[in-house]
Amino acid sequence: MSGTTISSDRPNICAICHQKAFGYNYEVVSCNACKMFFRRAHAEKIDDFCKKGGKCFDGDDLLTSRPKCRSCRYKKCVNLGMRYHNSSESQTQSDEEPSPKQSVVAVVPQHIITQAHIDSTFFQHLHALNETRYNAYCVINICEDPSFCDLVAQGSKLSVYLRPQEIEWENTERKLKPWGSLGVLLAVEVCKGLSFYNDLLLSDRVLLLKNVAFKSHHLSVAYDSFIQKKGRVLAPTGTEMFPDVLFEIPKCREIIMDLLTSPMKPLMELQITESEYLLLNMIVICNPAIQGMSPSGQDLLSRHQQVYARILLQMCMVSNPRTGPGRYAAILAINQRLDRQSVITNRVVQCLREYWAPNFFFSKILTEACRSDVYY
């Protein structure tokens, strides 16, 4: 049988230039172009000097423009584990040094860590974080009103959120279960579970949570309802986010429906996958453009955002090279569309206070996240 069979569990992204690969060459997952380059470079004993500091192949965006620097390309081949095996030299050595007795040699596969393997660990960690968030969202029932400063100082509160309290919300000042506030609390836990979070200054952690937890929450609950094939965002219990009485008030219903359907529309249009959602959520969180963030914080977030963006672009290109760039851009555009949620949220609570409860409660974290005094 002729042809090339690609194993479904084998990495198919070239570890050197991030183009499409068809298997291992010289012990590293690589494309045919990099395989031939390494062979020629080894034969020619390349010693080119890099004019750009030796970092031409260190970038994340190698899909669209493969650098021409031979020195950096060869160095990356060697660093990733490419080894040239000359069969004639091996045979000559074997003939010159015969073994006194026949022996059985067990060939043990070498475990080579490629960029594709590293990327797969990202998905495992992100999937676990998201699953924990969703499971906690199904049971969380806590009546607290912390600020983002409080949340940074307290560390993780996930164990508290997983022990629901008995609360009759209609008898509290909030009047209804604050799914929005509770969801943002869990988005904060996702941020705290990321590897770089503890490397940020305390002031940068507060700024990060204040600026990204709200958007991350809206993206996450939209995805939760999308995979359950719902037409709008629902609570994890399958019930409405708001009491039925509010849907009976025409002005409130219109704005509430806008809030609950807007984040789901692009997910439904793109039929976004779980991996795409997880990466987009990280791109939303790793925002280096937050005003007031320290230079070290901006650099840290920028580097992580570039990593997640690179993996997302790779996925789109491998899935369909022709439509990949367009899909990549459309997924990133969801980030900008989420900015509307704070505006719509403000309108929702203004409406609730005008037509339903004049003293409608607005939590500290949502006050800070929306930079206003209204939310649900």
UniProtKB/Swiss-Prot annotation:
Gene3D superfamilies: Erythroid Transcription Factor GATA-1, subunit A, Retinoid X Receptor. Keywords: DNA-binding, Metal-binding, Nucleus, Receptor, Transcription, Transcription regulation, Zinc, Zinc-finger. A zinc finger (NR C4-type) spans 14-34, 50-72. It holds the Pfam family zf-C4. SUPFAM superfamilies: Glucocorticoid receptor-like (DNA-binding domain) (SSF57716), Nuclear receptor ligand-binding domain (SSF48508). It is found in: Nucleus. PANTHER family: NUCLEAR HORMONE RECEPTOR FAMILY-RELATED (PTHR45886:SF14), NUCLEAR HORMONE RECEPTOR FAMILY-RELATED-RELATED (PTHR45886). Orphan nuclear receptor. This is Nuclear hormone receptor family member nhr-124.
